[in-house]
Each structure stands twice: as C-alpha cells, then as structure tokens.
Amino acid sequence: MSHVPPGGYWRDLSDDLQREYMQGSYFLGGGKTGMARRLSLDEPSLTLTTSPAQKQTERCHPIETRPLQVREYARIQTFPDDWEFKGSLGAVYKQIGNAVPVNMAAALGRALIRLLNKI
C-alpha cells in the first residue's frame, strides 16, 4: 500500500507489485477496483464499507499507510465528533459503513419538510 498514490489503487503500482499484491486475482483481469484504494485529500471519499480492513474493500489513509480509524470513518460520514457508537470495533465500523451521511440526511429531511409544507 505504501506505493499507492493518494486517490489511487492497485493498478497504479508497477506490474511486479501488482502481481505480488493481487496474487492469483491478477490473472482474472478487469474489475477489482476496490482493492488497495488510497483516499485522496482533494476528492470526495470512496464509498465506505462495513469491513474496511479486508483486502477486497480496504480503504487506506491518504497520507499514512494504514486503515482509517473509527473516528476518521465517522467524520467522513459527517457524524459529530462527540457522537458515541456502541458495540465491538467491527460493529462500530458496520454502523458507520451502513449509515447515510448525517449532513445528507439532514438536507433531505429539510427538503421533505419544505415539500410537505406546500401541500
């Protein structure tokens, strides 16, 4: 992952590193764009999954070579910093990955209220 540039993924690696990283999957061709993804600082986030540390769905920090921490995951989904999640680490990642971004839900709610007030 250290060789994947910000905003990049496994196909941005040299051919030798692609083969090493992807192993047998390398020869299947096509797809698999979710593997070895590094977030970008300048673009919207990739879709957050419920299992960020699995090879098929991993999301790497844009600068550091590590998975995103729970609080970073929550910030991407616009949860307030003081929001408390309950459960195991896996359960918390699942809650955040399954969530609709807070700011998006709020905007949809306000739009619905405006629409209903016109009826």
What does each model-found stretch correspond to?
Residues M1-I119:
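C-terminal target-recognition/interaction regions appended to catalytic cores
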